[in-house]
């Protein structure tokens, strides 16, 4: 090609490529974590992933971060070539050279060799940073060698950003020094990135990630589909995308292979060849990985692979439509393959889909008990057991015991008791062997706790540990976990600490996954009961990390911890949760949660709905829980729902009717559970007297009673609400100064523990029905409620970062911590006194106490030491 013609060709090609670059990036978000600046020392950034992971977008964005007029960037997109695969090394070099230098070099170029040499000279002598961004290379033989040579020969200020045309292209690059590869795992969207898309928020983003697995193409489709609540594999857009962009690009035999592979629980050469009676998997699997990267190795074995769950569901549907008559046969072979290898959960999953339960008679005792009691696959086994004939279950003791366990944790206690009783019948197979390890008695003991019969469960669990604990470590972990949960529910926090330690040892030594989740639930629930939301969040994060290391199944883990996370986030700020996430957790708790779990989700969901103005829906949720409590014979749950209904009615109704509350004579639960309910009853009674606008003395009496009960069980949230009621009552009695100090005490506790919703809720409730409430709150100093109310994001970050106090013997009070916060912000003694409504002498007295406790001599060192101890 003549130089003039070559120059014109480069101009046309470059314009087309840069037009494509602008189009590709339209409506897309820049992901800073994937930008070259995140890998400043790297020479090459390589994006290697399946179709639809945003590789082209990343390369296009990198090209756009440096102005073309600077002459420091070249953007090559092979899809703009006139006939892909016909571009020689010299033409590729000409395109890069033209985009970097413009017309300047063309006057001295005489041949193709001159073009390549001129490009080499330009890059090697460049003083400023140069970017070469290439999208789609690898489709032809030409160009790859040139690019690899340029990478090796040019200085570090010349950087390359490359998206190969297929997953296996440019394999040698991956082995070079200074090459950073971003794979599918790196390129999936995070929740934070989804939030940047139009119309997204944090709660909705979580649903998007769960539905799509973060696959960027599917995220984009979900934003536009009219059926986002349906499974992603069923969206018309998804089906069209997979058909047109993936299946049509595959050879016929490969297309058939991946459809068949989707029917497997895990994809491996041996499994595929066994199920389908072939010998082709050893060729197809490497070919698919090399060219399309559709399979990902599992964590447990590099030989076993999985595909993206949405793609798998789509391909399974395709298999059903083409070979429906073979579906059951194939799944039975899959089940037998895993059964033979001892992979029983996979086997049960496959058999369940095949509706094959004939082998239930052959299942060994150890297998079913392991899957049920240790792995805790409650939902999977519940579906499976429902399809197994009851007569078969009753004839085999291990099935009866396991099914009873499943039913107890599915809140079907009456049926569980009947099934468990059937395991003692003389015709039941294998009972003697199971009783040697105490399985039946363990299920009975723990089952009592699921029905809120804690006193009986505590006794039975201790008897079980004394009798069977040394010969059944899995069972011991379950029994200790049950005792820990009982201690948490009864607010016996000192006993809980010891039981958490003993339970963790037993669970880890026996790899007890199900008990691990419940043990963490007990620990988290205790912090929520205390109202220490900041510490609860840190425990939640640590629990997820530990579960990841242990390999705990995420199915139950995510739902259980998610129900607790909902309560934590709602207490920090209702804006952090969504209707969808709250409803999902409520439905899970309704089916699988014991009293405290279900009540926590019910209270959170109903309060969220009430605050959103959906008051009828909020009260309907409480009624739904109350009905469930009556059906399941859970009087404590029924009582808690009644109290919350009374509170809502009190705030909502115009009529000044007394609230309908349980009588204290009905409190027949554990001692501290009774205290918690007494506190709530007294609180609602105080609110009612305040609503009347008179009887302030009676209102104060009830508030003090609530405060006393809440303090006895370390219930900070009820304590804060009671302090607000007490403050309004004494304000109505004429004691303005005492009222203000009481509110400041409540606000200091709120800030320290991050339980903001409780404070905001009670304040709004009091202002909604008491005319004098606004007079009280308006007379407080502007800073009295602390700066936390002004900046949610700051207080959120601080709360997340606050660790548990390492010095448990510290005598520093909440008020003194608030004073330290004032000191850390540079306030004078006078300013602190004005904020906290105390005298300057009192400030000095507190500082003296703080210095003595922290063993320091000045304010600067006091702040530093307080931070080291986790006080700030």
UniProtKB/Swiss-Prot annotation:
The gene is alkS. Residues 805-870 form the HTH luxR-type domain. It holds the Pfam family GerE. Disulfide bonds: none annotated. Keywords: DNA-binding, Transcription, Transcription regulation. It comes from Alcanivorax borkumensis (strain ATCC 700651 / DSM 11573 / NCIMB 13689 / SK2). PROSITE patterns: HTH_LUXR_2. GO terms for molecular function: DNA binding. Residues 829-848 bind DNA. GO terms for biological process: alkane catabolic process; regulation of DNA-templated transcription. Pathway: Hydrocarbon metabolism; alkane degradation. Induction: Induced upon entry into stationary phase. This protein activates the expression of AlkB1 in the presence of alkanes. This is HTH-type transcriptional regulator AlkS. InterPro entries: Sig_transdc_resp-reg_C-effctor (IPR016032), Tscrpt_reg_LuxR_C (IPR000792), WH-like_DNA-bd_sf (IPR036388).
């Amino acid at each position: 090609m003549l130089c003039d013609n070559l120059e014109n060709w480069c101009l046309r090609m470059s314009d087309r490529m840069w037009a494509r670059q602008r189009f590709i990036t339209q409506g897309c978000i820049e992901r800073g974590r994937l930008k070259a600046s995140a890998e400043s020392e790297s020479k090459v950034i390589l994006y290697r992933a399946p179709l639809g992971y945003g590789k082209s977008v990343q390369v296009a964005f990198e090209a756009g971060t440096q102005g073309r007029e600077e002459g420091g960037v070249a953007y090559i997109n092979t899809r703009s070539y006139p006939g892909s695969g016909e571009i020689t090394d010299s033409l590729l070099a000409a395109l890069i050279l033209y985009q970097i230098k413009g017309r300047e070099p063309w006057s001295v170029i005489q041949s193709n060799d001159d073009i390549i040499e001129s490009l080499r000279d330009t890059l090697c002598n460049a003083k400023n940073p140069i970017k070469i961004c290439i999208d789609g290379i690898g489709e032809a033989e030409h160009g790859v060698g040139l690019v690899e040579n340029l990478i090796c020969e040019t200085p570090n200020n010349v950087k390359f950003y490359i998206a190969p045309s297929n997953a296996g292209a440019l394999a040698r690059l991956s082995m070079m020094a200074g090459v950073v590869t971003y794979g599918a795992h790196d390129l999936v969207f995070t929740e934070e990135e989804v939030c940047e898309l139009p119309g997204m928020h944090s709660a909705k983003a979580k649903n998007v990630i769960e539905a799509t697995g973060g696959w960027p193409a599917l995220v984009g489709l979900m934003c536009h589909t009219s059926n986002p609540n349906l499974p992603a594999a069923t969206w018309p857009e998804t089906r069209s995308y997979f058909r047109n962009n993936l299946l049509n690009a595959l050879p016929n035999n490969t297309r058939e292979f991946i459809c068949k592979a989707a029917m497997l629980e895990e994809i491996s050469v041996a499994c595929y060849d066994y199920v389908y009676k072939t010998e082709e998997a050893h060729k197809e699997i490497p070919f698919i990985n090399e060219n399309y990267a559709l399979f990902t190795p599992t964590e447990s074995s590099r030989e076993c692979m999985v595909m993206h769950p949405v793609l798998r569901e789509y391909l399974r549907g395709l298999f059903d439509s083409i070979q429906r008559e073979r579906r059951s046969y194939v799944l039975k072979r899959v089940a037998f393959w895993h059964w033979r290898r001892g992979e029983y959960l996979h086997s049960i999953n496959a058999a369940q889909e095949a509706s094959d339960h004939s082998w239930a008679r052959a299942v060994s005792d150890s297998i079913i008990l392991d899957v049920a009691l240790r792995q805790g696959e409650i939902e999977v086994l519940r579906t499976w057991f429902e399809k197994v004939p009851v007569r078969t279950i009753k004839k085999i003791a291990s099935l009866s015991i396991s099914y009873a366990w499943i039913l107890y944790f599915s809140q079907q206690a009456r049926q569980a008791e009947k099934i468990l009783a059937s395991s003692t019948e003389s015709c039941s197979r294998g009972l003697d062997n199971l009783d040697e390890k105490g399985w039946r008695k363990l299920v009975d003991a723990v089952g009592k706790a699921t029905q809120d019969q804690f006193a009986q469960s505590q006794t039975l669990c201790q008897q079980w540990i004394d009798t069977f604990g040394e010969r059944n470590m899995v069972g011991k972990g379950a029994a200790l976990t049950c005792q820990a949960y009982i201690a948490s529910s009864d607010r016996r926090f000192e006993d809980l600490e010891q039981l958490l330690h003993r339970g963790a040892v037993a669970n880890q030594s026996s790899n007890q996954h199900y008990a691990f989740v419940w043990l963490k639930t007990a620990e988290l629930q205790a912090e929520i009961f205390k109202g220490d939301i900041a510490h609860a969040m840190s425990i939640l994060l640590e629990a997820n990390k530990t579960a990841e290391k242990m390999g705990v199944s995420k199915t139950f883990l995510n739902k259980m911890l998610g129900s607790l996370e909902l309560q934590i986030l709602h207490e920090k700020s209702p804006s952090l949760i969504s209707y969808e996430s709250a409803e999902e957790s409520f439905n899970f708790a309704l089916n699988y949660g014991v009293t405290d779990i279900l009540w926590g989700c019910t209270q959170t969901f109903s309060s969220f709905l009430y605050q959103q103005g959906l008051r009828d829906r909020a009260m309907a949720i409480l009624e739904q829980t109350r009905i469930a409590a009556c059906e399941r014979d859970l009087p404590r749950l029924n009582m808690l729902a009644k109290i919350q209904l009374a509170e809502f009615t009190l705030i909502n109704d115009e009529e000044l009717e007394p609230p309908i509350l349980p009588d204290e004579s009905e409190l027949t639960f554990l001692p501290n559970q009774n205290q918690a309910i007494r506190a709530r009853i007294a609180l609602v009674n105080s609110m009612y007297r305040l609503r009347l606008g008179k009887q302030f003395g009676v209102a104060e009496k009830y508030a003090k009673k609530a405060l006393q009960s809440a303090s006895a069980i370390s219930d900070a949230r009820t304590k804060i609400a009671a302090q607000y009621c007490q403050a309004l009552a004494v304000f109505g009695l004429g004691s303005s100064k005492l009222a203000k100090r009481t509110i400041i005490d409540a606000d200091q506790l709120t800030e320290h523990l991050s339980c903001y919703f409780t404070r905001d809720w009670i304040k709004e409730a009091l202002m909604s029905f008491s005319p004098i409430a606004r007079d009280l709150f308006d007379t407080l100093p502007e800073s009295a409620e602390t700066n936390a109310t002004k900046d949610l994001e700051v207080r959120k970050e601080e709360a997340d970062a606050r660790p548990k106090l390492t010095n448990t013997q510290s005598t520093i009070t909440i008020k003194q911590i608030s004073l330290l916060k004032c000191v850390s912000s540079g306030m004078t003694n006078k300013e602190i006194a004005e904020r906290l409504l105390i005298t300057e002498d009192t400030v000095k007295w507190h500082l003296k106490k703080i210095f003595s406790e922290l063993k320091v001599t000045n304010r600067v060192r006091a702040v530093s030491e307080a931070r080291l101890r986790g006080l700030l």
